[in-house]
A protein has these predicted regions:
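RNase H catalytic domain
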Residues: 27-31, 70-146, 153-155
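RNase H-like nuclease fold core
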Residues: 2-67, 71-75, 79-81
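Charged phosphate-binding loop/patch that engages nucleotide di/tri-phosphates or the phosphate backbone
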Residues: 147-166
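Glycine-rich loops and low-complexity Gly/Arg-rich segments
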Residues: 46-49, 63-66, 115-119, 155-159
């Protein structure tokens, strides 16, 4: 099932050359509300895949849409032994047009600067990122990531703290 789904995404976007495929989604609203994210991580060379997810008690939707890729790249660097021995070609798939345009440097990377700074550093050590836009829920993996991101966000909603002044 997973291999046919990966092939569907490869065919949909005409992806051929890559070492790592990341398909993710985020769920958030405003900075004072919880956010969640999910990312399908596929290392083509090792034929290893997993779903990464996370969230926090704050975060805008744009923050949540970017978080899966920063975290997946950080995870990948750890899996590589914290050192890249050669360039690593990464295909990133997102339904966030803003995230993709910032990733491809059509828009500036000034919003969510801490995450973009980390991504910039990862690019400087050899990650070659290609950002691809897909419409929302147009493949099974994106649908799965959308659902997991929303569920993860809800986990943090129940733990929301009072942000009032003391």
């Amino acid at each position: 099932m997973v291999t046919s789904t990966i092939k569907d995404v490869q065919d949909q976007l005409k992806l051929t050359e890559y070492d790592l495929l990341l398909i993710g989604d985020g769920s958030g609203t405003t900075i004072d509300q919880s956010s969640g994210w999910s990312c399908f991580y596929f290392d083509k060379n090792k034929f290893f895949y997993t779903i990464l997810k996370g969230g926090c008690s704050f975060g805008t939707n744009n923050f949540a849409e970017l978080a899966p890729y920063f975290n997946a790249l950080w995870f990948d660097l750890y899996k590589q032994g914290n050192v890249l021995k050669m360039d690593r070609k990464v295909q990133i798939v997102s339904d966030s047009e803003i995230t993709v345009k910032c990733g491809n440097k059509i828009y500036s990377r000034n919003c969510n600067l801490p995450l973009w700074s980390g991504i910039n550093w990862l690019e400087s050590i050899g990650y070659k990122l290609t950002w691809n836009h897909v419409n929302r829920n147009t493949n099974h993996i994106s649908k799965l990531c959308d659902r997991i991101a929303g569920e993860t966000r809800k986990m943090f909603l129940t733990n929301q703290t009072d942000s009032g002044m003391i």
